[in-house]
Amino acid sequence: MSEAGFYNGKIDGIWGPKSEAAYNAFIARETDTSNLDIAWSAKVSPEFIQRVKMMCQNLKMDENGPDYMMSCMAWESGETFSSKIKNGAGSGAVGLIQFMPSTAKNLGTTTEALAAMTPEEQLEYVEKYFKPMKGKLKTLSDLYMGILWPKAVGKAEDYVMFDKAEAPTTYRQNSGVDLNKDGKCTKAEAAACVMNKYNKGMLAVNRRVKI
């Protein structure tokens, strides 16, 4: 404690009130995250961070919006935040939020063009994609639904997206998110994977010190 600067009294080897106070101060300092930037900020450039913050502000997201956005991109890009990363299943999707070829076309570009961009440049198209949902992305699950199943944005957490009985093919393609294996994939179940990325991204090791 003395070497860490939390105790300047006589060191007697006895654990007393002053020792406990110094220890508590040390723990408080080491667990204080107020000087850390948004989730996953250690993985990207300062410019990327600022663009994400501005984008979330433009989309009328809450104060946690940048953390949520970074968590969704961490999930979609396998924590790489690469503009070039491709879908492993061969769907043709690419980039920060795995733009499908049809999605890229609707945004006035192509997946090839998106893959040729820097991550910072591609954020322009991430914002363009979410723009029709401006003001509606209030929760982490809503934001992720904006990528996975836009019809679920604003719905309750128990909203059923894929039902085995009603749409067996769609359910089979997404059965991995049916966590309780009841034949129904809910919004909350689908968002659970992204919540895990949020929790991981908020760890100090994955965040930059604010500039």
Q: What name fits each language-model region?
A:
Residues M1, G5, A21, E157-V160, ...:
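Intrinsically disordered, low-complexity segments enriched in small/polar residues
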Residues S2-L36, N87-G90, T111-A115:
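Short acidic, glycine/serine/threonine-rich helix-capping segments at coil-helix boundaries
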Residues N8, E30, L59, Y198-G201:
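Short, flexible helical or helix-coil boundary motifs
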Residues K10-G13, P17-K18, A113-A115, P168-V209:
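Acidic, glycine-anchored loop motifs typical of Ca2+
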Residues A22-F26, Y125, G146, C193:
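Generic alpha-helical secondary-structure signal
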Residues Y23-N24, V160, K164, M202:
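General N-terminal targeting signals
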Residues S34-D178:
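Catalytic glycan-binding domains that act on GlcNAc-containing polysaccharides
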